[in-house]
Amino acid sequence: MNGYGSPYLYMGAPVSQPRAPLQRTPKCARCRNHGVLSWLKGHKRYCRFKDCTCEKCILIIERQRVMAAQVALRRQQANESLESLIPESLRVLPGIGMTAGGEGNQAAPPRTEELELRWSSPEPQAAPPTCAEATEDTEEVSGGENGGSSSDREQDVSSPEGSKPNSCYTPEPPETPSHPEEARYSLPKADNSEKQPKAESPPRKYPVSPAEQSVLIEGLGGSINLPFSLRANRPPLEVLKKIFPAHKPPVLELILRGCGGDLVGAIEVLLSSRSADGSAHPHADPHPDTLVVPSNGHLFEHTLASYHPVSSSAKWSVGSAFRVPETLRFSSDSSAGVVSSTPLGVPMQHSPFPQHTRYPLMLRNSLTRSQASPFVHNDVTLWNTMALQQQYQLRSAAQYVSPFSPARSGGTVFRSSPILSPRPPEEQRVSLQEESCTLGPKPGLYSPEEEYEERSDSADSRIINASS
């Protein structure tokens, strides 16, 4: 038994059957320099050449420092890339806790508290040799002599203070840096020194319940617990209530339902409606809380129809039955129409084709809950859109000449058409409001057998009169 350390490597006779290649185990480079083969695991404390100062051992020391600096640089880059993946808002949330957080002394000074989270200090002579994988990396990359550098690194770390287990990711107790090098390589750098007490102290004030689930993100420099109960998982209706506190929750719920549950779309609709109310419609109601919304949302194809009184056609859905044409919108400063400022006033259009109650207001009771005012903005909007729809159909029919319908004399048909009648007196227009408040359905203006013929006759007569 020679005195070169234990365990030993005995070279036996060649085996007849070839064996499978074994995984390479790291050897002590200092012992190899002196002609001895020793396994590196559990050997560095007992190596007889750990204090040798020959040329080869000095070269191993210098190479060890270079490799330690490289490993420290890689670890720092890995930490920075991990921090860049986590958004800034998540780093300061109270639910985030590092795996090493909360293990140090709570009564430590602030500088010690900043150094409490240390992910395997990358000091040139301390951190890399404590990991077995760093040793293997050194052995595999640099060959035989660099294996000695890894062993030398482990010797320099653990010889004055005793052997330690492999502690790549185990947190060290908080200690103040002895020299500026260690402070420079420690985790809380200049940009992280302000964020760390924020991420560390709140869990003490607000302890996380054990039932709360969290996801663990592991990296080269450590791991971070991210809770599932982040603010981003809040229901969309709650987010809308926070962003638009002036609106009623039923209004927000209807708009969100009309957008198909899309939170971003609902926010865009609300913002666009707010800007449109402030700029294009100064006569509209400035307080959206005063709008009375139906309790059920199936009255309209798009819920925005029950939201704002006089709005641009961009807010109406494309397939809506009550869509207002872009060219026939009401404008507040238009000379063609006079809009009454009282809540009972219905906009009367001085158009060539005055409108009658072709579409009675059948939905008024379901739209309004207060019987004080018979007309609210939703009723006015519904009346406007249906009247404009009819006017739009008549105008569009007047633009085309049908080659299949015979020409008729325009005078009699034009006067007999109830839609194209001359302007009614003022009393008839005022009585329109009282007449439309009834709940029963009104008889149609046309009988079923005359409806198609009367419409085609009126269209042809308008074409003849326009050409004459």
Swiss-Prot record:
Skewed-composition ranges (Polar residues): 157-169
Coiled coil (UniProt feature): none
Functional summary from the UniProt entry: Probable transcription factor that plays a role in configuring the spinal circuits controlling motion in vertebrates. Involved in neuronal specification within specific subdivision of spinal cord neurons and in the development of a coordinated locomotor network controlling movements. May regulate transcription.
Name of encoding gene: dmrt3
Keyword DNA-binding among UniProt keywords: yes
Domain DMA: 234-269
Single GO MF descriptor: metal ion binding
UniProt xrefs under InterPro entries: DM_DNA-bd, DM_DNA-bd_sf, DMA, DMRT, UBA-like_sf
Family membership noted in the UniProt record: Belongs to the DMRT family.
The keyword Nucleus belongs to this UniProt entry's keyword annotation: yes
Localization in the cell: Nucleus
Region (Disordered): 96-210, 408-468
Keyword annotations from UniProtKB, A to Z: DNA-binding, Metal-binding, Nucleus, Transcription, Transcription regulation, Zinc
DNA-binding residues (ranges): 28-75
PANTHER family per record: DOUBLESEX AND MAB-3 RELATED TRANSCRIPTION FACTOR DMRT, DOUBLESEX- AND MAB-3-RELATED TRANSCRIPTION FACTOR 3
Record-linked Gene3D superfamilies: DM DNA-binding domain
GO biological processes: male sex differentiation
Pfam families per the UniProt record, alphabetical: DM, DMA
Domain of life: Eukaryota
GO cellular component annotations of the record: nucleus
Record-given protein name: Doublesex- and mab-3-related transcription factor 3
Extent of Basic and acidic residues compositional bias: 191-203
PROSITE patterns: DM_1, DM_2
